[in-house]
Amino acid sequence: MMSRQAFLCSLGSLYLSLLFVFLLMDVYARPANNSALKEKPADSRDENEILPPDHLNGVKMEMDGHLNKEFHQEVFLGKEMEEFEEDSEPRKNRKKLMVIFSKVDIDNDKKISAKEMQRWIMEKTDEHFQEAVEENKMHFRAVDPDGDGHVSWDEYKIKFLASKGLNEKEIAEKIKNNEELKIDEETQEVLDNLKDRWYQADNPPPDMLLNEEEFLSFLHPEHSRGMLKFMVKEIIRDLDQDGDKKLTLSEFISLPVGTVENQQAQDIDDDWVKDRRKEFEDVIDANHDGIVTMEELEEYMDPMNEYNALNEAKQMIAVADENQNHHLELEEILKYSEYFTGSKLMDYARNVHEEF
């Protein structure tokens, strides 16, 4: 019969063997860790931090030539625009709107004049400008890793391509050694356009280095007269069909690329044409000769143009001026709240006197 000592030794050996088998199975069951090959570098940036935005707050037209559908709300609400969300409580939004009304009505006569609205529009536009300046500081730090206060085109190019998913160290090495970069045609086209824009933002004498102020102009052309001209040229280039560097009404209202497949799409296209026709004829074409020049479009696009702000103020008042006294009263602005804030306030008339 096996001795007690021999039995215990045998049991211990069996336990160690089973433990070894389980550990081996666990190792092979785990997925291979390839994250080092596929994972982006920790300092790679999101594409939205790298690319100039298509939408510019407080500017009437998008970078791609589309009308800014939120322009009225942006120049009326400024930084408070985010607070007026459609799903927020109507009573709270009504109170916020009443507070805004009292701020615009600086002479406290219970109505808003065109001059008062003009002053308010300029103030809210400046808020958007200051917001862009603060955001630019963060974006500039993202592309200025050595913190020397300047960003070269190559530094920006590396960050941009890294944001597209390419390995940042490999890109940097290839650019340093003047090696060919294998990127797709679409990315190359974007890169070429960005380089043109970079050159325009580079104040004389050009050195392809942007400081923080120049980088602000690169991202936000509305902050620089020179870059605003460049933006206008880009928009006209995209819309101008006969190459005369001017826009006719038919060129301006041309439908986006695509076919109309159903009634809903047709309605969208009808709205596109109607809105752009009105904007062209009533606002952009200043001398009403049926042609929009670069100079006219530049004046239209300039968010700090006081004459434009006054015209905008008059238009905003006209939308809600039901008693035709050329002023806005509280009841009117509450009734047309969706136009001014993007939020519809229900039962505005019933509550206006009890809350104000």
Swiss-Prot record:
GO molecular function terms attached to this record: calcium ion binding
- Signal peptide location: 1-29
Provide the residue positions that the database annotates as binding Ca(2+) 2.
D144, D146, D148, H150, E155
Q: Where does Ca(2+) 3 bind?
A: D240, D242, D244, K246, E251
Q: Name one GO cellular component term.
A: endoplasmic reticulum
Record: residues binding Ca(2+) 1 = D105, D107, D109, K111, E116
Instruction: Read off the CDD domains from this record.
Output: EFh_CREC_cab45
Q: Which Pfam families match?
A: EF-hand_5 (PF13202), EF-hand_7 (PF13499)
Q: Where is the EF-hand domain?
A: 92-127, 131-166, 227-262, 272-307, 308-343
* Subcellular location(s) of the protein: Golgi apparatus lumen
Name where it mostly resides: Golgi
According to the record, which residues are glycosylated?
N33
Which residue spans adopt a coiled-coil conformation according to this UniProt entry?
Answer: none
For Ca(2+) 5, which residues are the binding ones? D321, N323, N325, H327, E332
What stretches pass through the bilayer? none
Q: Which residues bind Ca(2+) 4?
A: D285, N287, D289, E296
Q: What functional role does this protein have? A: May regulate calcium-dependent activities in the endoplasmic reticulum lumen or post-ER compartment.
Q: What is this protein called?
A: 45 kDa calcium-binding protein
Organism for this UniProt entry: Gallus gallus (Chicken)
| Gene this chain is encoded by | SDF4
